[in-house]
UniProtKB/Swiss-Prot annotation:
UniProt-listed Enzyme Commission number(s): 4.2.3.5
Residues reported to bind NADP(+): R48, R54
GO BP of this protein: amino acid biosynthetic process; aromatic amino acid family biosynthetic process; chorismate biosynthetic process
Keyword annotations of the record: Amino-acid biosynthesis, Aromatic amino acid biosynthesis, FAD, Flavoprotein, FMN, Lyase, NADP
Full protein name: Chorismate synthase
A molecular function (GO) term: FMN binding
Amino acid sequence: MSGNTLGTLFTVTTFGESHGPAIGCVIDGCPPGMALTEADVQLELDRRKPGTSRHVTQRQEPDQVEILSGVFEGVTTGAPIALLIRNTDQRSKDYGNIVETFRPGHADYTYWQKYGVRDYRGGGRSSARLTAPVVGAGAIAKKWLRERFGVEVRGYMSALGEIEIPFVDWSHVRENPFFAPNADIVPQLEGYMDALRKDGDSIGARIDVVASGVPVGWGEPLFDRLDADIAHAMMGINAVKGVEIGAGFASVAQRGSVHGDELTPDGFVGNHAGGVLGGISTGQDITVSIAIKPTSSIRTPRRSITKAGEPAVIETFGRHDPCVGIRATPIAESMLALVLIDHALRHRAQCGDVSTATPKIAARAPQAQ
């Protein structure tokens, strides 16, 4: 199986399965000399881990990270960094009814047809459990970006099903299990999720991610454009079915006189481009939105087929998130950070000594605030 590595200079290769003994990743290309401890990584993993509220899977995984290599006396050495997270709460018996039957909406059918073998326990390699090592790697990328460039990568849930969540303040995000930027709407979200669970159904979500402080110049046209790599990484997250950069699909209804972000000596007048022009960062906030589909594992009986091609009706048991989007915010943040650190290193390698006489303008002109 190929396709398990993300990045060019800063690469992340994940390994493991949902019900195997452990999951993890190997990070190659991390610059040496950065202070790093397991506690730095654990902070991010704790934001993603399961069992933290009644609205997510009740699989109780501590997601305790172990750094096996690449760090000596608390400092990165430049050698590959191996992160290991042991699985401790597998319950494989919950999946006995799908050994011979494919779950609708899951990767069961496609993995079987492609590889001729399938780990049915929790989806095996296709499980969202594998986003944990991504978040671990993202913690390292975030730390380097913040310390080296002052870049901050933050995200929030902007919609849960048909409920739009107006942005109020970043401080609200860390105060509720939905990563909602509006504390007043949390009771409505909780009631919505309780009703879904009672119905044995699920729902999707939209997550917005913002990277602030990214300097102008990151991105490698034509085919390694910054926005192209962001979209590629975001689509690598389980259940993501859509990605927008900046105004995204709303650009269809915008006139050029509106969408084109004007430049003034004092800064950009708008940011419909989402901080990327021509595949290169503009120095503005990089804004990304992802659409996450409803969880496919639900208790509602649905039609399927067996390995023999016979019709079947399947009801999924086990401990599943009624909305995988609830825990997706730190995952999306990590994916964006991994793309940014990779492009920061690529830019430094080729264009680190390039300078022009044109001043770098502000991300947003004062009159546009």
